[in-house]
């Protein structure tokens, strides 16, 4: 049975970040039951295996910033920018695979920095 997963979660208040970026403002969470884990740790844990589209956009005031999209703590994408940048990847996820975003940069909050995860198959 195909279970559709759709998640949009954005950064709360802006702050300097060195490590996992916490996206605390959950806007959409269809098919996701572990929303407290995402809010508290910034880590998405896959509950339903499938093919996923993962999209991240980050806004920062720093002229040279970098962030990493991680699957099970391994880099699957990197974003470099002087103000706003986005990264989109497609990944096969199995149950308990994790997705997180890390970096050492100032991250603007609200809808200026968000993580989107969509199960496409």
PLM-predicted stretches and their roles:
Residues 1-121:
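Extracellular jelly-roll beta-sandwich "head" domains, especially the C-terminal globular C1q domain
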């Amino acid at each position: 049975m195909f279970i559709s997963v759709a998640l949009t979660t954005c950064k709360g208040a802006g702050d300097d970040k060195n490590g996992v970026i916490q996206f605390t403002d959950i806007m959409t969470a269809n098919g996701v039951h572990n929303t407290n884990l995402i809010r508290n740790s910034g880590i998405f844990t896959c509950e339903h295996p499938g093919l996923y589209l993962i999209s991240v956009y980050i806004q920062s005031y720093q002229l040279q910033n970098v962030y990493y999209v991680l699957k099970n703590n391994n880099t699957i994408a990197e974003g470099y920018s002087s103000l706003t940048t986005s990264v989109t990847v497609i990944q096969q996820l199995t149950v308990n695979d994790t997705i997180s975003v890390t970096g050492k940069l100032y991250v603007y909050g609200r809808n200026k920095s968000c993580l989107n995860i969509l199960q496409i198959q």
